[in-house]
């Protein structure tokens, strides 16, 4: 079995994330794409949307797609989970012959700082979602995406133009409510 893991905060999920999901399904030779929202990203202190809400948005957007599985492993841990731990969990579950780990190009600069990076690098092939034409090292796969949007922009401005139609109204109401509190 060939699998790919796309983890993230998804706070909120947006068209950039959607582009990564659709490109991965189209361009990678995989049997399963596992989308795994984080409980708390090891590199962030907090989220705006709680883990249950982010999981529901992700499930609503991509849970119906063929080959896609929405996984709550990291959320169930109720703590920051390093990627290596999620990868080992999925290895035990699926024993894949090929394992792709999808990450944004913005993570490249600090990738070597990730927990147990050497072991992680030996277990997966990194696929870089490249939205800014950043030079991707030759030992990584380049997954071109055409969306240049950040979740923080959506949260800060309440501009939901780049939020997927299926959840646009929910996202706007959710963050408006947070801003009022």
Curated annotation (Swiss-Prot):
Function as written in the Swiss-Prot or TrEMBL entry: Catalyzes the reversible adenylation of nicotinate mononucleotide (NaMN) to nicotinic acid adenine dinucleotide (NaAD).
Organism: Campylobacter jejuni subsp. jejuni serotype O:23/36 (strain 81-176)
Catalytic EC class: transferase
Lineage of the organism: Bacteria, Pseudomonadati, Campylobacterota, Epsilonproteobacteria, Campylobacterales
GO biological process, one term: NAD biosynthetic process
Protein name per UniProt: Probable nicotinate-nucleotide adenylyltransferase
Keywords for the protein's UniProt record, in alphabetical order: ATP-binding, NAD, Nucleotide-binding, Nucleotidyltransferase, Pyridine nucleotide biosynthesis, Transferase
GO terms for MF: ATP binding; nicotinate-nucleotide adenylyltransferase activity
SUPFAM superfamilies xref list: Nucleotidylyl transferase (SSF52374)
Signal peptide location: none
